[in-house]
Amino acid sequence: KINKTIEAAAIVDRSFIDSDAWKAKVIEESKRETIEASERGSRIHDMLESCFKKELEPTGDDASIFHAVDALLKVNCGEQNWRSEEVVCNLQKGYGGMIDLVSDEWVIDFKTKEFTTGSKQLAYESMAYQLIAYERALPAPPKRIANIFISANNPGVVVFHEWNEADFNRYWTIFESSLTVWKNVKKYWPERHNKEEESSG
């Protein structure tokens, strides 16, 4: 969002408006660009889901994106039976989610953002907390986890980032601690409801 605000400030002409009006215009432009980026990311996710489910034959820029992602997966993961947008639940811990792409060996999450080849940092550790939560909600055996970064402004530019298995327990501790805080703030413990249902059943 900060980057979008900076970009908006760079393109909004301040020659003919006062300072307050210019600031308002920058904020308006920043919000518009943020919404557009979010919608573009959702559309790319939906397109990839349809392609991996073999419901769509992509064309144009979509074809460039899908074939780049597919090739990247083959290089880094080998041949896999991928399942797209799979819902998982950890009833014991009381959380769930939807995985972008999963197989018997891998959990993959897509991230769309504007970047070019050679961009310095795309992966941030907080992304691993989401992935390890998905991984711990799945049945054995343990799975490897990775993000695929998809350029929204350079179709076909994709980057694969696998997270180190040696850090999995630490990622899980951080996620579990954050989940506990969230539940206590919200006063919401779905796992207790699950136990009550099991007892009554």
What spans do the regions from the language model cover?
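Short linear sequence elements within intrinsically disordered, low-complexity coil regions
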Residues: 27, 57, 71, 139, ...
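Mg2+/Mn2+-dependent nuclease catalytic core
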Residues: 82-187, 191-192
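Acidic, carboxylate-rich catalytic segments that either coordinate divalent cations
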Residues: 192-201
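General "foldedness" signal
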Residues: 56-62, 121, 159-161, 196
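Metal-dependent nuclease catalytic cores that hydrolyze phosphodiester bonds in DNA/RNA
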Residues: 1-96
